[in-house]
């Protein structure tokens, strides 16, 4: 599953909207539920399930038979069920049928069937008749609405199959499924397997769609969808591929077909195990809280993560859609074909898919420089993991609450980065063989993390098990402090790194991890650092750099002389990915008060002419954070903005206007510089942005898309009522999700108080889908100009706000309050949410307070140094900013 917030934050670098990163931390339910695993004495083997949904009444009936294997005689059977009404339950075993009494435990989300006599050991069949509702909660079997009709769709991961049909809803209880859907004439149905037959009835206005038997799989991967879907077809390696949508958006499906075809062929070759099904459907849903979900053979998506106009889409949008498609398709092997034994190892599913998604996309579009995006994501994860409230990758998870909270930036980001580190150490081909061996040993079954790294250890004959256990079992980021190379060796010490200098690390915590040095032939020369090692052999050559490839999961600190040598040769001695790594390390040192903001800004100036968009994006991200979180006065902010204009203005000018011959990198670089200069209030850029934005609105095909969308964002942040009205109309009428959601987000970016008020009112008006409302409220909290107004609105209109929050989105809103940077702000946030509880937000509130405290501390320590640096740059004098 790709969470909507995860996919956004994972590729945002140090994006402006830190609210998206917060939702990667913890935004999920905190309802207190008792931990209760199902007994292992009864195991399902096969489900026969017939559902009859009524899309107008938002309800359905179900007829279900479950073939089970009973390990020992018992007169009770326990399975998972919630929000299901049982009509009848019976069991047939040994030729005898018994009718059950049913007792429900809502807290444990279980149903217990009690029978008059013991069921003998061996095979038996449960027969269940039940009814349910098509809920509005975006989970289980739920209703999705468009302007013209309703759809009935599913989202089961992690523990919501039990909301749709009674089931043994744990990943280890794999079974096969025969699914039939009785639906209205004119509707279509999609499920995991191809259609076996489609017959009229029962009744004149219904038809029954029966699907072929599925492979053996876990409940959370089951899917069934009903509505008016239209599809574009393709075929690859003997597999029928379809991308489906509502009828008005089917023109936006061909890009997804092309990407899916490429990715399927790539994965068949990479894994050495062919995709096991005869078809693969990718379906865009109007209402869908996750970014996407890897249902076996029937992957579901948010519309923005699948549907795209290849002619008018920006590079970023094309990249995002391709990566999300590749992520979910990776799960068809890693998660669906082979599934974790229990949710404490969900990181192996999600981390692997996050790591794997980059490979086919990088091969498909080398010009997108995916490796630089990976490096930026790694940098973001290191910052996330350097907070005191982080967790180990593998953590205890028993209740639905605990399981839900496992789907965070650690399970996706850190797990992916650890795999990247190990692959860099072993080499790509050795690592690939280990992946193949792991999958081949556990086909259609369950496995543990130990199974995975044991396969890698056996394949490589290197200590992968020790490295993985070290990085997976303990929280936090290693800080490696290097001495100067001498005699072919370098002294190195390690300790846990925290962004807050007030937190003292546990000196006993150490890691076993590979450290790769740049060798004389420009390859990675790796050594394994263990807790007992204090010196490593290093190859000769200068400058000395200890993270060759930029793929190590650690922060680095160098002696002053070594650091100066690296910076002096940064363009020639380091690759773009390594430059991103160095920028991240230096910024982290600023956050931890081990370096000054002036040192970082000097490094930014050193890479200002870098031709790689990823490097410039990383550099400007640190600057933007300094502008927002360190600069404390209007004069300091104005001085920083003037510095950016003078430093990057000439670079932007040298790029010149867009050309059809521009590479994707050049387009992204131009847009990043344009955005930075717009944020810095460059008058010429603001005028240019307004002109481009209006042209782009009138005819999207007339403007280079990446620049057009950037211009629109700049114009909105400086915009008037006329532009607001244009964007609101697009958000309500466009059939292109990229334009529709892009315009919706920009409504929350306006800064004039009357337009901020309109955007806030609109967010709670009922005209914004629930999956989007929390983000619309969170965005204005991120900037100085609109924060206080947005916070007052949220407090004053809490009943309306709360009505828009879904089960999972409350934490996004609560977490966004971490943008405050004052004692007063912290007190207000704590006080308000102490009396206005949000069920999804306990962890998000902790992270919010942590961010506020971190900002207060960062500003207190670094603001004087920023002022001194601005003075030395002649940007500020006597409290007055220089133009």
Where would I find each of the regions flagged by the language model?
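Hydrophobic helix-coil surface modules that form long, contiguous segments used
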Residues: 62, 153-159, 166-326, 355-358, ...
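A surface-exposed beta-strand-loop module
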Residues: 83-146, 203, 533-539
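Ligand-binding face of N-terminal immunoglobulin V-set domains in extracellular IgSF glycoproteins
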Residues: 61-81
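N-terminal, polar/Ser/Thr-rich
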Residues: 22, 27-61, 94-96, 146-150, ...
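Solvent-exposed beta-hairpin/edge-strand motifs
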Residues: 74-99, 510-512, 516-518
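Hydrophobic alpha-helical and helix-loop surface patches within well-folded domains
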Residues: 86, 96, 211, 240-503, ...
């Amino acid at each position: 599953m790709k969470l909507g917030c995860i996919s956004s934050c994972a590729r945002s670098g140090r994006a402006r909207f830190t609210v998206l990163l917060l939702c990667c931390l913890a935004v999920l339910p905190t309802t207190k539920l008792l931990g209760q695993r199902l007994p292992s004495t009864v195991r399902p083997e096969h489900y026969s399930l017939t559902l009859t949904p009524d899309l107008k009444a938002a309800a359905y009936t179900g007829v279900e038979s479950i073939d089970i294997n009973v390990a020992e005689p018992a007169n009770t059977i326990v399975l998972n069920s919630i929000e299901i009404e049982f009509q009848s339950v019976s069991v047939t075993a040994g030729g005898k049928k018994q009718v059950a009494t049913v007792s429900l435990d809502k807290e444990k989300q279980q149903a217990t069937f009690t029978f008059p006599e013991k069921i003998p050991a061996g095979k038996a069949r449960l027969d269940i008749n039940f009814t349910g509702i098509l809920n509005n909660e975006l989970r289980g079997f739920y209703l999705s609405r468009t302007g013209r009709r309703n759809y009935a769709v599913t989202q089961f991961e992690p523990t919501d199959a039990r909301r749709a049909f009674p089931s043994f809803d744990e990943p280890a209880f794999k079974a096969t499924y025969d699914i039939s859907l009785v639906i209205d004439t004119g509707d279509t149905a999609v499920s995991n397997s191809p259609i076996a037959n489609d017959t009229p009835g029962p009744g004149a206005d219904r038809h029954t769609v029966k699907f072929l038997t599925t492979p053996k799989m876990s409940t959370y991967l089951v899917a069934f969808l009903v509505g008016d879907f239209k599809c574009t077809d393709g075929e690859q390696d003997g597999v029928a591929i379809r991308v489906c949508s509502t009828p008005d958006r089917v023109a936006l499906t061909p890009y997804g077909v092309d990407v899916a075809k490429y990715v399927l062929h790539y994965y068949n070759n990479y894994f050495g195990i062919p995709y096991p099904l005869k078809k693969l459907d990718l379906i865009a849903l109007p209402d869908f809280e996750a970014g996407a979900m890897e249902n076996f053979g029937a992957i579901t998506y948010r519309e923005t993560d699948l549907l795209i106009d290849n002619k008018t889409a920006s590079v970023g949008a094309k990249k995002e859609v391709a990566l999300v498609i590749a992520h979910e398709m990776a799960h068809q092997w890693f998660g669906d074909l082979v599934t974790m034994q229990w949710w404490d190892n969900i990181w192996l599913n999600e981390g692997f898919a996050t790591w794997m998604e980059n490979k086919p996309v990088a091969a498909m579009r080398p010009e997108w420089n995916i490796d630089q995006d990976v490096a930026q994501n790694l940098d973001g994860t290191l910052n996330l993991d350097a907070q005191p409230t982080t967790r180990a990758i593998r953590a205890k998870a028993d209740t639905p609450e605990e399981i839900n909270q496992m789907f965070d930036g650690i399970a996706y980001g850190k797990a992916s980065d650890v795999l990247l580190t190990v692959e860099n150490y072993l080499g790509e081909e050795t690592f690939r063989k280990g992946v193949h061996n792991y999958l081949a040993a556990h086909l259609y079954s369950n496995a543990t993390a130990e199974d995975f790294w044991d396969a890698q250890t056996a394949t490589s004959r290197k200590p992968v098990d020790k490295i993985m256990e070290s990085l997976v079992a303990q929280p936090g980021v290693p800080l490696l402090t290097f001495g100067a190379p001498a005699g072919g060796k370098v002294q190195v010490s390690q300790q846990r790194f925290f962004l807050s200098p007030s937190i003292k690390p546990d000196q006993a915590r150490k890691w076993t991890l590979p450290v790769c040095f740049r060798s004389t032939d420009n390859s990675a020369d790796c050594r394994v650092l263990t807790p007992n090692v204090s010196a490593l052999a290093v190859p000769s050559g200068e400058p000395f750099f200890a993270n060759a490839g930029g793929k190590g999961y650690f922060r680095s600190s160098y002696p002053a002389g070594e650091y100066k040598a690296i910076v002096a040769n940064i363009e020639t001695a380091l690759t773009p990915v390594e430059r991103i790594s160095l920028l991240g390390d230096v910024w982290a040192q600023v956050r931890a008060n081990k370096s000054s903001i002036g040192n970082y800004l000097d490094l930014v100036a050193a890479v200002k002419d870098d031709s790689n968009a990823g490097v410039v994006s990383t550099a400007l991200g640190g600057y933007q954070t300094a502008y927002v979180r360190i600069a404390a006065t209007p004069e300091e902010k104005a001085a920083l903005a003037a510095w950016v204009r003078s430093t990057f203005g000439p670079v932007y000018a040298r790029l010149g206007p867009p050309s059809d011959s521009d590479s994707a990198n050049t387009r992204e670089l131009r847009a990043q510089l344009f955005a930075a200069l717009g944020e810095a209030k460059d008058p010429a850029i603001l005028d240019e942005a307004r002109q481009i934005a209006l042209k782009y609105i009138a005819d999207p095909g007339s403007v280079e898309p990446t620049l057009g969308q950037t211009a629109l964002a700049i114009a909105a942040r400086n915009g008037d009522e006329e532009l607001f009205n244009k964007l609101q109309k697009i958000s309500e009428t466009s059939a292109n999700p990229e334009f529709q959601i892009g315009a919706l987000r920009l409504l929350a970016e306006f800064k004039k108080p009357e337009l901020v008020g309109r955007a806030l009112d609109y967010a709670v008006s009922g005209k914004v889908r629930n999956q989007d409302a929390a983000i619309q409220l969170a965005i204005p909290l991120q900037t100085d100009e609109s924060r206080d107004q947005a916070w007052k609105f949220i407090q004053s209109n809490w009943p309306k706000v709360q009505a828009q929050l879904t089960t999972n989105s409350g934490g996004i809103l609560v977490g966004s309050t971490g943008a405050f940077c004052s004692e007063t702000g912290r007190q207000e946030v704590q006080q308000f949410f102490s009396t206005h509880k949000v069920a999804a937000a306990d962890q998000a509130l902790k992270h919010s307070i942590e961010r506020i405290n971190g900002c207060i501390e960062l500003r207190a320590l670094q603001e004087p140094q920023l002022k001194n640096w601005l003075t030395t740059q002649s940007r500020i004098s006597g409290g007055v900013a220089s133009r």
